[in-house]
Amino acid sequence: WGPETNQQISHVFHKVEKDFLITSGMIIPVKILDTIGGYPKNFFIDGIDIDICAKAKSKGFGIYCVKGCVLKQQFGSNLTFTFWGKTYPASNYNPQRLYGIFRNHIIIYRSTHSLAVLKLIKGYSVAFIRAILLFENNKINKLQAIARGVKDGILYKI
């Protein structure tokens, strides 16, 4: 048995406001999706959650994480490497996935001008490029895919 319909249950969970969350496991009222224009139609996979969150924040909606909920999810190969005593993650994504990540995130920034999105792009860029240069195989193809993704994102090529 669950709580009565329309009953406030926020007192049961501890929630924390965030700039972004992954959409896997996210509960979004249809009315909010309608207000923000729904999911991006031209993105294959990467950037969908960031686009949804950035558009929702721009319309005054909050993004909340309910603490204590766990969604086990693996990104890429989930490898870690140690370099000079520090451990780094490496996704080992294929070049096509890296292209999509960079293209979509730049397109999202261009459409929202969100500083939080820009900060996220900078963080992703450093992490992915560092991992590729230091630990991953197929370096040239991956870096070329990132460069094409950045270029196509700037040119708004979907």
Residue map of PLM features:
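Acidic/His-rich active-site region of diverse nucleotide-sugar glycosyltransferases
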Residues: 1-38
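Aromatic-acidic/polar surface patches that form glycan- and anion
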Residues: 21-22, 45-46, 94, 98, ...
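A short, conserved alpha-helix in the catalytic core of glycosyltransferases
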Residues: 26, 32-37, 42-70
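Active-site donor/metal-binding and catalytic loop motifs
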Residues: 66-89
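A short acidic, glycine-rich active-site loop
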Residues: 85-99
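A conserved mid-domain beta-alpha-beta active-site/ligand-binding segment of alpha/beta enzyme cores
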Residues: 101-106
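Non-catalytic, C-terminal membrane-associated alpha-helical segments of glycosyltransferases
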Residues: 110-158
